[in-house]
Amino acid sequence: MSSISKAGIFIDVKQLLDFTYRMNKEMSVADRRDYGSQLIKYNLDMITNFTMAYHRRDEKICFDAGDKHYDINLKGEKRVYVDALEASFDNYMALMEFCFATLMFPRMTTRKRRRRHKHFMELMAKISTGIMKWSGSIYKQVFVSERREAG
């Protein structure tokens, strides 16, 4: 579990999971389901809003995550930023998988939960593939074009 702050994002997944576990012990099933859906919706917002905009002229990425707006300056250690973005999504995938399996369906049969979970993870895979394609295109635009200019 890692924290990432280089890209202007600070995620501490372990802390989030600990908080979720503590809340979970005190909650009724209805409250837990409501809390789980809110947590997932928030994280889905974080991911879907991460489609953002790349400004070639200014060499920066702008995006909204939840209620926060970030500008990531790509000048300088550019590769570090892209790595940090990719790593942050791995953390979100792990967090959402946990939330979905344990909070959303506490009284479901294992079979039903597996089926729902599979569907959810397929959705997450589609979203994360889109994200990786996006960060890959940033890599090509920023780094490959630099090599061409230098060569």
Over which residues does each language-model region extend?
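Amphipathic alpha-helical assembly/interaction segments
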Residues: 1-151
